[in-house]
Structures are given as structure tokens and as C-alpha cells.
């Protein structure tokens, strides 16, 4: 099975940690795993890029502004069309939006999986124009999720949040796991 994960950056956070564990499990099952990164990593934060490269994961970096770059859309479309992935798995709102826009024009019907890693608009302050635009964007994005093959939430709380955005979505809960064997924070 050929899978492409799409994510905003590889700076380690919750979504990126989950992605790394998921990719390691997929590699153990001998899947052909690729990662498309929309934006650049912040040099002041830890990146999981070296861990992915060490495991032989093909990484494509678009290196443009994370969402509003026409060339990034064209490059991602070309990659998806040429590679003919069985699954395209997006991991954050910007990634979801780009995959939604591009997938409509792909000749092969790859399955699109969306992972929702948190309640994205709930940390915003009220009243700010930019925050109101983000909330509007999330409501619109939840309508785009209807065309996904599967929507995965990390918790029941996130599932409820998604369903409040769009009651027509069928959301599956798959909680994060902790890889104790590879964790430095746990003692055996």
C-alpha cells in the first residue's frame, strides 16, 4: 500500500509525534510511506525530519507559504497524480484544505483520510477579526471533510467538537498511543 501523509511542518508537536509513531507502524507493515510537508520547519524547534529520513521515508517539501501559494498546489497536484497513492492522509487544517482542493482534480480516486488532532478553533480569543475568520474557516473546512473517506479524531472530546461543526460527519475515534519502548520519559 502506498501512503502519503500531508502535514504543515515537521516541528515536533502532538500531530507530528503521532505521525512519527504511525509511520513507524506502517513501515513495520512494509507500506510505502511518503510525507509531503507544506511549509518550512522552525529552526528553533525540534524537527522529526532526521528520524523519518533515517527510516527511509520519502519527504517532499513544498517550501512555500503554508496555504496561499499557487505553486505549492500545482506541485502537490503533480506529486499526487504521478505517484498514484492509495491513501492520502492529511493531519492539520491547512493540509486538509489543500488536499480537498487538489483531490477533486486527480484522475485516480485515492482514499482521503483526515486526522483531527485537537479542537482547532477553541483556543482563540473572542472578538478578533482574525480569530473570527479562523472560526469561519473551520466551519467551512468541516463541510469539505464530508468528501473524505474517513475522519479520525484523537478523543471523544474532539469527536464531539467535530460533530458540533458538522452533524453530517461520521467520525471515528482512535486515541493517541504512547510508544513506551521508544519513549525516553518512561522508566521500565
Where would I find each of the regions flagged by the language model?
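Membrane-interface segments of envelope glycosyltransferases acting on lipid-linked substrates or membrane lipids
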Residues: 1-188
